[in-house]
Amino acid sequence: MHAVLWSVGEPGREIPMSAQENKDLVRREQEELWNHTGELDAAEKLFAAAQAEAAKQQAADFRRGFPDVVSTIEDLIAEGDKVAAHWRSRATHQGDYMGIAPSGKEVEFTGISFYRIEGGKIAESWTVEDQFGLMRQIGAIPEPGRSEEASPT
């Protein structure tokens, strides 16, 4: 008895990636694009053509202000073509960021990003991060109950 097994798909139709492959792609995005040791050109191999330049520019803008950034993934969940990532970044404010001069302060903040994967690349992404906390840590937003000027005691 012989058994022959093969897979036939519709012409032009892509075989969906597995949940693990999608999670691995998101891990690579964090390591290869967002961490200070990564290359900005990694965006071209990680993102769909329509998204690559915007992703590269966002990473460049952030890394200009925080050149030593290290991002770690705390949790990843994948279902179908979607991946959710909870991540944490640590860095030192060493360059201009959103018009704010370098403070030299170390920061730590978290975020959650959602991705849609298509054809082995990130087709869309949405991120919610603690920008308020980040701005407070670099001194752009005063701590509650503290004025900008020192009050005499």
For each predicted feature, which ranges?
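C-terminal and inter-domain tail/linker signature
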Residues: 2-153
